[in-house]
Amino acid sequence: MTRSVCLALLLLLLPSLTLSAPAPAPAPVEARVPFAPTPFVGSDGLRHLAYELHITNYYGDTGALQPQSLQVFGDDAETPLLSLDAPALRDWVRPSPSGDGAISIAAGKRMVVFVWLSLPATGSMPHVLRHRMLLGTERHGSVELDGARVAVNAAPVMALAPPLQGGRWLAHEGPGAAQSHHWGSLVAVNGDLTIPQRFALDLVGVDERGRAVRPTTRDLQHTRHSDWVGYAAPVLAVADGIVRAVRDGQPEHPPLTAQPEPSSLTADGLFGNYVVLEISPGVFASYAHLRTGSIKVKPGQRVQRGQALAQLGQSGNSAAPHLHFQLSNKATFEGSEGIPYVFQAFDDFGPESEAQLFGQGDAWKPGVAVPRGNQLPLNDIVIAFPPR
């Protein structure tokens, strides 16, 4: 009788036992976050963390790895702050997968995941982030990365005055766009791999219709610099500081024409005419593509918040007149890491596409101006800074 009862109990337990799949083996990868993220408030009112997770597939025996999902956790929580499946991951990795192909990390290769965390405006901020990624293998089934912890940098970001005055400006290639040439550009120079332009903005002047070129212009392929709304606008110091680097005398290219290849991945190779200010110890504001002959300051000079530094132009690696603005932790472009910041005040008129800059596609319809304070404009919104 006892033997029959035991056998019945065993049969009842078997279904539950067979449902418990073994945990995936630890992934044979190296994973790390090279530069700790710092939270900032975006123009959507949310707090954001933007950073990169580097994953290297070391072993040839494993074969190619296929990332299937990514979860990001705060501290010791088991509820993820972010969950991405394989299709969603495609938009946030470099190298980008070709065509409709699956994401894959070949043996001996590295993949970079650009992580964009959006958190409520209020509430606690995690102290540490942890990453869990499930990867498929060619020979060994699924494996799992669980770790790659990184501490969140709790230092406050700098609140800046406007780099331009009044007017309307498209905040192009801005934060939140992993495929942009700013955040998406890793710079490998002399042993360092960094992202100097992580939070850079290309500020393109627009009129009340959202057009970058004045309405008298008939042929976009043959415009003059003066046809562009933002050209020659005064460029201003965003804070008190010391001029650390200046370059002038570089020519400006005709708008919307093929650009020469950069001579180097440095400020001299990319920025054309530029000014770099140190606005706090270890915090540098870079202004690039300035108008030839317009720079008013010299290295070592002290400047005050709102002081005119130069004029907006189109020198260096630039297809059209605009101001490239960024904050980083070194005076040089190469070897520096882009750091977040906020502007003390601007108006937000809503999103605009690059095509709408030139009157193509649906006409841009500005939203009601929303005042923003101590926020960073996110990618492709039209903003206006207060007049001086």
Identify what each model region corresponds to:
Residues 241-243, 300-312:
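A structural signal for short beta-strand/turn segments enriched in small hydrophobics and glycine
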Residues 155-173, 180-188, 214-216, 262-267, ...:
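Acidic, glycine-rich catalytic/binding loops that coordinate metals and/or anionic ligands
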Residues 240-291:
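Zn2+-dependent peptidoglycan hydrolase active-site motif and core
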Residues 79-123:
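Intrinsically disordered, low-complexity Pro/Gly/Ser/Thr-rich segments with frequent PxxP/GP/PP motifs
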Residues 236, 279, 283-306:
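Short histidine-centered loop motifs in beta-beta connectors
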Residues 55-62:
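Asparagine-centered strand-capping/turn motif at beta-strand->loop junctions
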Residues 34-35, 45-52:
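Short, solvent-exposed loop/turn segments enriched in Ser/Thr/Gly
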Residues 118-159:
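Terminal connector regions
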